[in-house]
C-alpha cells in the first residue's frame, strides 16, 4: 500500500507540474526552444577543433581534481560544459541574429559561453572575480577578453568603454546567493539601472540565469513580480529583458 501511494503521489505531482507549465506558458517556451535547437544545430566538436589541445591539456594537468563534479575544477570537462553553453546560445537565438552581437557576460567562469558565441560570429567580454586562476588561463587560451571585478550590491560596474547588445549572467552567485543578505528588488533595481544606463546599446537585452536557493526557489514572489513589472519574460530560472537598452 505504501509503495502504491508513493507511486500515485509521484504521478500526480508530474501531472500537476505539466498543467502548471501549460498555464504559465513554459510548455510553449520549451517547445519553441526545442524546435530552434533542431533547426539550428551546433556541433561541439567543431568548437573543440579550434581549441589549442596541448594548451588545454596543460591547464587540465595543473588544475584538475579527479572525480570532481561540484566545485570549479569540474569546468575542465569541456565535453560536459560546451553542450550546455551551446544550448544557452541557441535559446538566446544567437544562431539566428540579423547581425553579430557584442556581448557582456557577467560571472563568465571558464568562458565557454563566449567561446560558443564567437563560433557563431559574435564577440564579447567576460567579467568575473580573479579566483580561481584557472578561469583566467582558459580565457587566455581561448583568446577571449576578460575583466576581473567583483559585483557587489549598490556598486556600479567598472567602465568598459563601450556599450553592448546583450548582457548575460548564468548560474548567478553575485546576488549573495544562499546568504542571509540575498538581493531584494532594491539591489536588483540598482544593478539593472546601471546596466541599462551605462552598458546597453539601443534595443539591448539582459538575460539572467538564476541559481536555486536553499529552499529550491529561484526568487521570492516579490522579486518575480519586480522582474515582470520591469518587463522581463520569466520562465523558472530564466529572466529575459528584451529591447530595454538605449
Could you tell me what each predicted segment is?
Residues 2-95, 208-210, 217-226:
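N-terminal accessory regions of S-adenosyl-L-methionine
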Residues 100-109:
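Conserved class I S-adenosyl-L-methionine
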Residues 112, 118-145, 151-153:
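Class I SAM-dependent methyltransferase SAM/SAH-binding core
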Residues 113-115, 135, 175-178, 214-219:
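Short catalytic/ligand-binding loop motif for oxyanion handling, primarily in non-cytosolic enzymes
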Residues 157-166:
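A short acidic, Gly/Pro-enriched loop at the edge of an enzyme's catalytic core
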Residues 166-185:
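A short SAM/SAH-binding and catalytic strip from SAM-dependent methyltransferases
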Residues 182-202:
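A short glycine-rich, Lys/Arg-flanked "PGG" loop and its adjoining helix->strand segment in the class I
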Residues 214-246:
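Class I S-adenosyl-L-methionine
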Amino acid at each position: 500500500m505504501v509503495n502504491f501511494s508513493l507511486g500515485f503521489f509521484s504521478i500526480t505531482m508530474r501531472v500537476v507540474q505539466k498543467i502548471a507549465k501549460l498555464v504559465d506558458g513554459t510548455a510553449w517556451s520549451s517547445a519553441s526552444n526545442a524546435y530552434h535547437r533542431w533547426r539550428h544545430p551546433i556541433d561541439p566538436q567543431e568548437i573543440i577543433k579550434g581549441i589549442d589541445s596541448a594548451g588545454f591539456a596543460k591547464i587540465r594537468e595543473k588544475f584538475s581534481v579527479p572525480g570532481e563534479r561540484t566545485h570549479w575544477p569540474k569546468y575542465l570537462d569541456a565535453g560536459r560544459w560546451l553542450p550546455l553553453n551551446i544550448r544557452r546560445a541557441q535559446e538566446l537565438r544567437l544562431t539566428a541574429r540579423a547581425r553579430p552581437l557584442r556581448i557582456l557576460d557577467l560571472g563568465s567562469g571558464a568562458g565557454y559561453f563566449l567561446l560558443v558565441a564567437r563560433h557563431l560570429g559574435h564577440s564579447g567580454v567576460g567579467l568575473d572575480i580573479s579566483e580561481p586562476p584557472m578561469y583566467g588561463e582558459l580565457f587566455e587560451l581561448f583568446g577571449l577578453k576578460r575583466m576581473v571585478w567583483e559585483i557587489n550590491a549598490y556598486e556600479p560596474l567598472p567602465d568598459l568603454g563601450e556599450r553592448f547588445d546583450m548582457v548575460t549572467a548564468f548560474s548567478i552567485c553575485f546576488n549573495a546567493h544562499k546568504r542571509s543578505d540575498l538581493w531584494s528588488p532594491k539591489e536588483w533595481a540598482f544593478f539593472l539601472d546601471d546596466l541599462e544606463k551605462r552598458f546597453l546599446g539601443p534595443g539591448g537585452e539582459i538575460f539572467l540565469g538564476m541559481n536555486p536557493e536553499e529552499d529550491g526557489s529561484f526568487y521570492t514572489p516579490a522579486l518575480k513580480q519586480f522582474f515582470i513589472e520591469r518587463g522581463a519574460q520569466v520562465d523558472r530560472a530564466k529572466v529575459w529583458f528584451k529591447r530595454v537598452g538605449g
